[in-house]
């Protein structure tokens, strides 16, 4: 399946790591880039593994929207599988939150 990532997810990842680098002087740009690469690799792998992850449990709006959830690098991602008119399945990642920021 093809994977599509909402702009809000990109923004959440960038803002978290920008803040982390400002607050933790030992966190360097090379380390952050490796973590971000792992996040995007994991999201791309949803094209293969999306159907095995459970229904979201972290946020109430994720639950009400019927999203599924997976976790990578302490980020929780909410996504849904859609079937297009031609029968093709796609994955759309709708939202993300880091474990440290969720209240």
Annotate each PLM feature:
Residues 1-67:
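Basic, Lys/Arg-enriched alpha-helical interface segments
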Residues 65-103:
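Enriched for short, Lys/Arg-rich terminal
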């Amino acid at each position: 399946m093809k994977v599509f990532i909402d702009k809000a997810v990109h923004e959440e990842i960038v803002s978290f790591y920008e803040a982390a680098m400002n607050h933790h002087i030992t966190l360097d740009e090379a380390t952050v880039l490796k973590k971000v690469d792992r996040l995007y690799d994991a999201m791309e792998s949803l094209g293969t593994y999306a159907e095995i992850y459970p229904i979201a449990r972290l946020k109430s709006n994720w639950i009400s929207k019927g999203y599924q959830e997976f976790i990578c690098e302490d980020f929780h991602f909410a996504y849904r599988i859609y079937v297009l008119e031609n029968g093709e399945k796609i994955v759309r990642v709708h939202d993300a939150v880091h474990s440290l920021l969720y209240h």
